Regions:
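Active-site and donor-binding regions of nucleotide-sugar-utilizing enzymes
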Residues: 14, 18-209, 227, 231-233, ...
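Short acidic alpha-helix that forms the nucleotide-activated donor recognition element
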Residues: 107-114, 286-294, 302-313, 334
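Donor-nucleotide binding loops and adjacent catalytic segments primarily
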Residues: 63, 67, 72-73, 78-80, ...
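Short hydrophobic/aromatic-enriched beta-strand-loop microsegments
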Residues: 95-101, 142-146, 191-197, 251-256, ...
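C-terminal alpha-helical cap of glycosyltransferases
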Residues: 397-418
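Charged active-site motifs of nucleotide-sugar-dependent glycosyltransferases
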Residues: 43-49, 217-226, 236, 251-253
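Catalytic binding pocket for nucleotide-activated donors in carbohydrate/polymer assembly enzymes
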Residues: 170, 186-187, 305, 310-384, ...
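Short acidic active-site motifs
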Residues: 107, 131, 162, 265, ...
C-alpha cells in the first residue's frame, strides 16, 4: 500500500504544483535532482549522504557537518522541503545539494546506485522506509542525529507498525531526550543514547562571532528593543494593538523578522499596522533622523535573524500562535534574553523545559502578550534574571556534537577534522 501511494505521489506531484507554490518549487527542484547528481557526484571519493527535511533540521546537523573532513569524503546534502533547499542550495558545508527524490522504489534504487553512500546521516525524525531498507541492503552505516521519538508517532499505531522494521537500518540513534530513548526501547531498539540536541552547540557558537550591525545600533539608540523573530500573521495579530500604541508613544524599538520575506508577505505585514515601519531593504536611502525616530524596523531579507537577536532585550519567537510550528528559541536564548512564544508548543520539548526553568513565557492572546511584554521590558531585575536563566540553559546543554563526532571517529578516523 505504501509503495502504491509513493508511486502515485511521484506521478501527481507536478500536477499538484500547479495549485501550490511550495509544491511547485519542490516538483521543479526534484526534476533537476538527477542532473545535479550526475554532474557533481564523484566516483573517486567515499560518500556521506546527509538528509534534513527542512531548514530547521539542517541547523541541527550543521555542527556535525562542520567537523567532516571533505578532503577524504564527498558530502551529498538532500532536503525534502523548499524551505531547506532554496535557502541552502549553495551551502559551503556540502559538495552536492539537491532535493531528495520521493520515496518511490524506482527513485530509491536510482538514488542509492548514483550516490553509493558509505555513511548516511538522518536528522530528527526522517524515516523514509524504502530509503532506509535500501541503506541496510547496501551495508551503509546509518545514524540518526538529534532524534525524537514521541508516544503518538506512527510507529505506535496499527497503521504504522510495519514501518518499525525500517528502523533496523540505523546503526545508532543519537536522541534529544530521555523520553525518546524510552519510546524507542518500547519499539525494541537499544542501540541508542541521549546525546542531546545539536542545536545547543550551534546556538552557543553564535555568541562567539561578530554580530554587530551598525544600522541596528543606530536604529535602537539607547532604548530597549523587542525582537520579533520568525513571525507569522497569527503572531502579528495578537501584538498589533501593542505595536500601534508603541509607535505613538515611542517607548521601545521593535525589530520584526518575519518568516516569509516575499514582497507580498512584507506588504501584508506592513498593511496590518496603522503606521509605516521602515524596511531593512530601504535603509540605504534612509537618513539618520528617520532611523532614530522610527519605532519599527522590518527585516525583509533572510540570513540576519541570528545577528538581530544579539540586539534584543526581549525576544518573541513566532510560529506557535498558529499551526506552523514553533521556530528556534535557542537562537534567541543564547544571548541571555527572555523569550515569549505563542500557545501551541506541545511538540517542542525544549520550550516546555525552558518555561519550567522560568526563562520562557507562553501567551495565548493579545491581553497576555501585552501584559507579559510590558512586564519584562519595564522590570529590569525580572528581565535580567529570566535572561540569565536562558543563557545558562544553553551553556549547560551543549556536548551533543562531541558525542556524535566521537562515534564517527570509530567508523573512520579520517572522517573527522582535527
Amino acid at each position: 500500500m505504501y509503495n502504491i501511494f509513493s508511486a502515485f505521489a511521484k506521478a501527481s506531484l507536478p500536477l499538484a504544483g500547479a495549485f501550490n507554490k511550495k509544491l511547485k518549487l519542490g516538483a521543479q527542484g526534484r526534476e533537476r535532482t538527477w542532473n545535479i547528481l550526475d554532474k557533481k557526484v564523484k566516483s573517486s571519493l567515499p560518500k556521506i549522504w546527509v538528509h534534513a527535511a527542512s531548514l530547521g533540521e539542517f541547523e541541527q546537523v550543521v555542527p556535525v557537518l562542520e567537523r567532516i573532513n571533505r578532503k577524504n569524503y564527498q558530502v551529498i546534502l538532500t532536503f525534502f522541503s523548499p524551505s531547506g533547499y532554496e535557502n541552502k542550495k549553495n551551502s559551503p558545508l556540502a559538495d552536492v545539494v539537491c532535493y531528495l527524490p520521493l520515496d518511490a522504489v524506482s527513485n530509491v534504487n536510482k538514488f542509492i546506485a548514483t550516490v553509493e553512500p558509505s555513511l548516511a546521516i538522518m536528522v530528527k525524525y526522517e524515516f523514509w522506509p524504502n530509503y532506509l531498507n535500501a541503506l541496510r541492503e547496501t551495508d551503509c552505516k546509518t545514524i540518526l542525529v538529534s532524534g525524537v521519538f514521541r508516544d503518538k508517532m506512527s510507529f505506535n499505531s496499527w497503521y504504522g507498525k510495519w514501518m518499525t522494521h525500517s528502523l533496523e537500518s540505523f546503526d545508532h540513534f543519537f536522541l534529544q531526550n530521555e523520553s525518546s530513548l524510552q519510546n524507542l526501547k518500547k519499539l525494541g531498539f537499544t542501540n541508542a543514547s541521549v546525546s542531546g540536541d545539536t542545536r545547543f552547540d550551534r546556538a552557543s557558537q553564535l555568541i562567539e562571532r561578530d554580530s554587530s550591525i551598525a544600522e541596528l545600533k543606530s536604529f535602537i539608540g539607547n532604548k530597549k528593543c523587542l525582537v520579533i523573530g520568525s513571525s507569522w500573521k497569527e503572531d502579528i495579530a495578537i501584538m498589533k494593538n501593542w505595536l500601534n500604541n508603541n509607535d505613538q508613544n515611542k517607548n521601545y524599538k521593535i525589530i520584526i523578522a518575519p518568516h516569509e520575506v516575499a514582497p507580498s508577505s512584507i506588504k501584508q505585514l506592513c498593511d496590518s499596522l496603522d503606521y509605516h515601519p521602515i524596511k531593512w531593504s530601504s535603509l540605504q536611502g534612509c537618513v539618520i533622523n528617520d532611523l532614530e525616530s522610527a519605532s519599527t524596523l522590518i527585516i525583509d531579507s533572510i540570513g540576519l535573524l541570528t545577528k538581530v537577536y544579539s540586539y534584543a532585550d526581549l525576544a518573541y519567537v513566532g510560529g506557535a500562535m498558529g499551526t506552523k510550528g514553533l521556530h528556534n528559541i535557542l537562537e534567541a536564548a543564547t544571548y541571555g534574553v527572555p523569550v515569549i512564544i505563542g500557545k501551541n508548543y506541545e511538540k517542542f520539548p525544549e520550550a516546555g523545559k525552558l518555561e519550567d526553568l522560568g526563562g520562557l513565557f507562553s501567551v495565548k492572546d493579545a491581553l497576555e502578550f501585552e501584559s507579559m511584554t510590558n512586564q519584562l521590558l519595564e522590570d529590569d531585575y525580572l528581565r535580567d534574571k529570566t535572561g540569565m536563566i536562558c543563557g545558562h540553559w544553553i551553556n549547560s546543554n551543549t556536548g551533543a556534537t562531541r558525542e556524535i563526532v566521537n562515534y564517527l571517529k570509530t567508523i573512520d578516523e579520517k572522517l573527522i577534522l582535527d
